[in-house]
Amino acid sequence: MAVLSEIFATKHRGALARSEALDAGGDVPEDVPHLELSDVTTLELEVLGEVAARTLRFGTGDLELEEVDLDHESLFELPPFLCEVLVELGRAEDPEALADVAAEWARSEEMTSTPAVTQPVVADLVELVTKASRDGLSVYLWVEPT
């Protein structure tokens, strides 16, 4: 069974409210930049960060997503280093960098996917994180409670 998840950009209070709406299965406003995904959890995003940082020779930093709040166990914030790496991936001089990262991410032990599936996900994620960075928003991952 696929694990449903959503990555979105907002302020802290908005993230808590969106997480509650997602947890309840209710209507969620469409005015927040977001990506609906399946089978992308905290671990897969950490691996994506490792792959992107290595490909870009960006260095090392904190890639571990942390729970935002004890009352919101399904909500995680992407750490600043991971966001910086993804923004840099969107600005990479090598036009193949994004495709290379997506392909290596697809081949990683943690993913069960193909580059054809991961490349649009990585491109959309880079776009969302870049917009969030420009707008001064944080990026969050919500994972469907199991």
Spans of model-derived segments:
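Acidic (Asp/Glu-rich) sequence patches and key acidic residues
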Residues: 1-127, 131-135, 145-146
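Short terminal or interdomain "cap/linker" segment that borders an active site or interface and mediates
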Residues: 138
